[in-house]
């Protein structure tokens, strides 16, 4: 749904990050909140992460897509009438020259059509969980390569915890600079105009 609604503090946002390099695709969701995260949103993210980690832990040669799908909740457990209604929310799919390839990992199809996991397979696993506030939700996705003895997660964008836009984060080299400390003057001016607009204040573009 498209709208002219300005993002507000506390809003959840998730992106499906799609790159292409030498013809090969990526597909991984990352979830953020604007300014701060509510308890409901944090709880939803933790639940979402737990289901994702449980699925990743099972990835190794000899396992099947049905075994992975079995660790995910039934549709009725998170507000949907059946598996078809929530298809692709708790989901896995191969990825390569196309974004969606085999194998497919889903409670809708994997139990009836299981596929053996083999070394060299590359696929994405994604999970979703609604928050108790009734309108927000969390979504996370990781890309995995199947090795001879297990798996390797190849996505590098942090997703262990819910990220909050505008908060300071730290690395081994020290704090990451906040966006507003880095932005150029034109970007800063645009941001100030958007913020003023959300407060219904009038700002002249020539100032």
Regions found by a protein language model. Give the residues of each.
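Active-site neighborhoods and metal-handling regions in enzymes and metal-associated proteins
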Residues: 1-207
